[in-house]
Amino acid sequence: MERYRIRRERKEILKNEIEKQRDLIQKEDFRLMSNENNEHNDEHDNRLIELNKQLNILKLELEELRLQGDRFYVLNGDDTILMDIDETSKITFYLCRHFTDLTKIPIEESNESRILIVNELETVSDPSIEPIFEFQKVISSKSIHQLFSVKTNFDNNNNNNNNSNNNNNGNKPSLFERVKQNTWSLGISPLRRTTSDPTIFGERFSPPKSISNFIERFKDNKEKDKEKDNSSLSITIQNNNTATTTTTTTTTTTTTTTTTTTTTTTTTTPTSSTTVNTNINQEKLRKYSTTPSINQINNQQNIENNNNNNNNNQEIGGKILLTWSNKETSMYILKTQEESLELLELLGSHIDRSKKVTAKQSQTIKILFQKKSTIYESTNPDHEEYLKHLWSLLYPEQEFQKKSPLWKKFGFQSDDPTRDFRGMGIMGLLNLIHLVQHHNDWVQEILAQDRDYPFAVAGINISNLIFEVFQISEDSLQQPWYSSFWSSSYMAMLCSMSRHNDHAFEELYFLIFNLLDHLWIQMNATYMMFPLVIKKLKSQLNEISNFNPNSFDEVRARFDLIQRLNIIDNPIDQQQQQLQQQQQSLPLPSSPRSFLNNYQQTTTSSTSISPSKNTQNN
C-alpha cells in the first residue's frame, strides 16, 4: 500500500544519511587521533558532540518508522507468506495466493481473510490489463514479545567461504562480513541486540577517554598491519613463481570448469488443485506478483551464481530464523539480504521497546508492592491526606470526618475505614482514590443500584486479586527480567497497557472491578456467593490474558467482549446450594488472603462484617 511504500523510501533515505553521518564522525575521530600536539581539542570535541546529536536524531526517526510496522513477503517451504507487523508489536501471518478470477476464490476459506489487487496502479493506467487478486488468509497471529531469538543469514556459504579465505590469507574478516551474520537474542542482554561474533563489541569506533592510549594502540595496529602486508606480499611472489610452471594445466582446468549446463525450471504459484485456473497468464503473475515462488527465487539465485563468476559482489537472497519462547522455530526466505536485515532490525526495535516498557513497569510494580506493604497509620499525615482526598471526592460538600456512617455507606465494614486497610496497606486506599477520581460516574451508578456487596471492601479485594493472579511477591520481584515471571501473559498484558498509559495498573483495576460487577449481575449472585464470583472472575482474567493483547485498547476490547457475549453458565448447582444452606454466615474478606480459603472457614477478626447488607444497615 501507499503508506508502506512512502515509509520504506523514507527509511532508505535515513539509512544513507546515517551512514554518511557515521563517516563524518569517523573522519573527525581520525583527525583528533592524528593531532599529536593536542591542538584545538575543544573544537574537535564540540564538532563530535554536534555530529553525534545529528546522528541520534536520524536514528530516532528511523526507530520511530520501524515501530510503526511494515509488511514482508517471505517464503516458507512452498508457501508464500505475508508477515504483517503493526504498531502494537503483533505479527499476523497470511497465506497468499493469486487469482485472476474472483469466482475461483473458495468461499469456505474466506473466514479471517482479505483480498487485495496487487496490480491496481497498472489497471488504473491501462484498463486492458486484467486485475490480479491476492487472496490472504490468516494463518496465525503472535506478539513479538513471544520471540526468543531472531537470526538472519545463518548459513550463508559465501560469507563462510570469504571468512575462511580471509583467515587463510592472515586477514581478519571485515566488520561488514561479520555484521551480516547478525543475530539478536533475548537471552543475552536486555535492551540491546547482539551479533553472533562477540569480538565486534570489543572494537571501538570513537576515541575513549584516554586518547593517548587509543593512539598508541592505533599505532601498534598499523605496525602489525604493515608486517601482515609484507608477509602476504612475499607469499604472493612465491605463488606467482610457481604459477608460471602450471599455466597449461590451469588453462585446461579453467576451460573445463567454465563449461556449464543449462537447466529449465517451471515457475509456479502455490495454489490448491481445485482453484488452479489453467487460463491464468503466468507471465502476468510473474510480472505483478510481489511474492515470487520458490522456483523463481531459485532461478534468480542460479543467475546470480553465474554472474558471481564475473562479479563477487552480486546480491543474494536473505534468510531469517525465528525462535519463539515455546522453542518453536520457523525459517523464512526473503528476496535480498538487505530485506532480511531490515526485518531483523524492525523486530529488534519492537523488542527493544518491549524490554524498555518491561523495565519501566517492573519499577512501577516494585513501588506498588511497597505501598501494599505499608500499613495505614492514623498518625501519619500523608496517610490521612489520602483519606481526606477520598472523602472530598465522595462527599465534596461535607466536612471531612475520620469516623462517619457515610464511610459504611460507601462500602466499608464500619464507620472507621482505616480498619479495612490492614490487608492491602495504603495500596487499597490509593486504588479506590483513582477509581472514584477517574471513573466517578461509574462508581455513582453502581452505588445507586445498591448491589448486594460492600463496594469499598470489594475494591480492596480486587487490589489483592491483581497481586495474587500476577504472583507479585517479594521473591518474584527479585527475579531477573528474562525470568518467566516478567514474561508471563499477565505481565505482558500489563506492559502492553502501560506503553501508552502511565496508570496501567489502576486502569486494569477498574476493568476488573467492572467485570466483577457484570459477573455479579449475570450470575444473579447474592452476598454469600462472593467467593464463587471471584473464582469465575479469575477464570475470565486467565482467558483474557491468554489472548496476548498488545495494547491498552485491545485489553479494554477483550474485557468488553467478555461482557457482551453473555455466555456465562450458572455456577451454582444443586449440590452447592445444599452446601450453602449448611454453611454458617461467612464474612466478605478485606485482607489479602485467598478468597476460597476465607470461604471455607469463618473468621472472627475485627475486620469481619455482618452476613448481609440488611444487618449492616441496622
UniProtKB/Swiss-Prot annotation:
Q: Which InterPro entries match?
A: ELMO_dom, ELMO_domain-containing
Q: Which residues form a coiled coil?
A: 1-72
**Source species, domain of life:** Eukaryota
The Gene Ontology biological process terms listed for this entry are: actin filament organization; cell motility
Q: Name one GO cellular component term.
A: plasma membrane
The keyword Lyase is annotated on this UniProt entry: no
| Compositional bias annotation for Low complexity | 156-171, 245-275, 574-592, 602-618
Keywords assigned by UniProt, alphabetized: Coiled coil
Give the region (Disordered) as residue ranges.
153-175, 245-276, 574-618
ELMO domain location, by residue?
382-545
- Protein name (record): ELMO domain-containing protein C
Which species? Dictyostelium discoideum (Social amoeba)
